[in-house]
């Protein structure tokens, strides 16, 4: 969200009129995606190979976590040390656009809005073993069985009958076919669900889901192997101080420091009077690793590794051809400037 300010007057301590805006401090949004895998053993797992002829049944319940991805995105937070007053001439048509936090987005034109696009979590699919849902497909014969081995035998026979019924439907070897296509799909779906539930009694089920957490990191200086979060086998994504997890490290190396512009003679340009301040950010290589492999590596713009300069405010109030400009809210740098 942003707001356009047209001739909005704010009085500062110098008794001048204009609009106060902020340049940003660059923060890093660290998005962490972890996958949780839940395995559940079926009550007849020990009979899977005997009655179904299938090895590899899950023999005990378990949960495990694995790191799926890490993404780092810079974003801007107003820097209280970098607040500026932009003055307006009475009766002028110029305007500036700020975001909801007071960061400068554009002057005399509509802004380009950047946003952090978060990864959507993947929900855990239902399992026939959840809350003993498989009991819904128990036949009367199975319910009357006196022992576990007998129940497994009856469940296997019921499973084979379901498979045979589905095959007969598909091949048309039934006394009466469903009335229409939708009825046929519904019957096949019901048979599939019953087969899945009975198979789960022997083979167990595996469910996966993704959990997403965000961590805020403020670059201040170069760092090596700063722990930003951990991955725990028991709890998934946890904070750095939770020693139950394996650490994930952030290293930051400044690759470019923002410098003040120079003129044709190689001298540093003078700041224009009542300048419209903007940032010339630096850059830093940001690396995240688990100590063995690199999870993320990118060169990112960072406002606090640069400098602040300014534009001559008169270019925005020229009556014949006023200039316009857009800015990056992540760094306060000029995105584009023109007429």
Which residue ranges define each predicted feature?
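N-terminal amphipathic/basic membrane-interacting segments and domains
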Residues: 4-7, 11-339
């Amino acid at each position: 969200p942003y707001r356009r300010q047209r001739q909005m007057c704010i009085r500062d301590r110098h008794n001048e009129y204009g609009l106060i805006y902020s340049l940003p401090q660059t923060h890093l949004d660290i998005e962490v995606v972890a996958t949780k895998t839940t395995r559940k053993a079926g009550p007849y797992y020990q009979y899977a190979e005997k009655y179904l002829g299938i090895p590899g049944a899950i023999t005990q319940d378990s949960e495990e976590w694995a790191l799926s991805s890490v993404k780092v995105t810079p974003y801007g937070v107003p820097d209280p040390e970098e607040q500026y007053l932009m003055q307006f001439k009475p009766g002028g048509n110029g305007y500036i656009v700020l975001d909801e936090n007071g960061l400068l987005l554009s002057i005399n034109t509509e802004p380009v809005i950047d946003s952090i696009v978060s990864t959507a979590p993947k929900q855990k699919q239902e399992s026939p073993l959840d809350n003993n849902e498989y009991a819904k497909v128990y036949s009367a014969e199975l319910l009357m069985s006196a022992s576990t081995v007998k129940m497994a035998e009856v469940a296997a026979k019921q499973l084979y009958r379901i498979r045979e019924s589905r095959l007969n439907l598909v091949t048309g070897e039934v006394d009466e076919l469903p009335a229409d296509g939708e009825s046929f799909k519904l019957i096949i779906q019901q048979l599939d669900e019953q087969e899945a539930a009975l198979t789960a009694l022997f083979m167990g089920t595996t469910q996966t889901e993704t959990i997403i957490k965000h961590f805020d990191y403020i670059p201040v200086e170069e760092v090596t192997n700063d722990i930003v979060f951990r991955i725990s086998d028991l709890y998934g994504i946890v904070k750095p101080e939770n020693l139950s997890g394996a650490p994930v490290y952030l290293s930051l190396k400044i690759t470019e420091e923002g410098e003040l512009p120079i003129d044709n003679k190689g001298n540093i340009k003078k700041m224009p009077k009542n300048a419209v301040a903007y940032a010339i950010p630096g850059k830093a290589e940001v690396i995240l690793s688990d100590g063995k492999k690199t999870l993320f590596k990118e060169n990112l713009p960072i406002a606090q590794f640069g400098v602040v300069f300014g534009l001559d405010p008169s270019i925005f109030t020229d009556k014949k051809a006023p200039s316009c400009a857009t800015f990056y809210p992540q760094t306060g740098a000029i995105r584009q400037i023109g007429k």
